[in-house]
């Protein structure tokens, strides 16, 4: 009887312990499911939304409202993203204003009164890209019988390029008006532009000085695209000569002078790489061959009509692709 009583007591205790374990296990599972549903799942939703936000989707919102804490967290995240979107929009608007300012710097520096004389005619066009570069052209009389002209392209984009363009244009003009030969203009301009050029910007340029009475022209090339020359009874051909180094690229560079004589009805075309490097949606370049072909197919058109026609041809080739570089042309 005693052993039987002890057995019954032990069995009762084991049953009680077993039931307690089952109850606690059931309670634990219930609490886990509740926590997962209320907290973990909601945190997962928030993390998924934050992942999309960090990937750049700022239009998505957090909308977890299971309790006041999650509602407050959702509102805080949405408010932060909204503020970020506003800052981004303001920064984009500021950049657009700066780009427009840079364009105005470019355009205001370019001559727009194109002379028409009995033995000389010049016309130029510069079409700025959205991402402003530093293209420029210039022409001016050095004497009653001498005129200087050039096309140039500054490296870089935005306001720094536009400001460097203004500096280069002013230096070159001042040196040319002092009576220096064209190669010496480039040699001294290079030295001046190298001074305090911590940004490492540089300029490609092609410049000619023409004597209107004799037709003799001296020219220099600082790493620029070769111009095209058409004799009165011939076709356009590239005027390929040995180009010097870019301006502001390195101190101590000296530039060669080239010479040729222009006759009545000869034509000379200067341009920047925005023409030949215009790219279409298939990532193909407009290129030198296509430019030469267009030039010869339209060789008799007056300059004032020719340059817009060439730009239209470039636009047709490019199609829907954006214009990434300035396009500058002078004839």
Question: What name fits each language-model region?
Answer:
Residues 2, 70, 77, 82-95, ...:
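Interdomain signal-transducing alpha-helical coiled-coil linkers
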Residues 2-46:
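Cytoplasm-proximal transmembrane signaling helix
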Residues 2-3, 154-155, 274-275:
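PAS/PAC or PAS-like capping segment
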Residues 38-61, 74-81:
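Membrane-proximal alpha-helical signal-transduction linkers
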Residues 39, 66-73, 95, 118, ...:
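The cytosolic transmitter module of two-component sensor histidine kinases
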Residues 55, 59-70, 127-128, 140-141:
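HAMP-domain connector/hinge
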Residues 86-269, 321-330:
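… and, occasionally, acidic/histidine-rich disordered N-termini of signaling adaptors
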Residues 159-178, 262, 266-321:
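Active-site-proximal, acidic helix/loop segment immediately C-terminal to a metal-coordinating Asp/Glu
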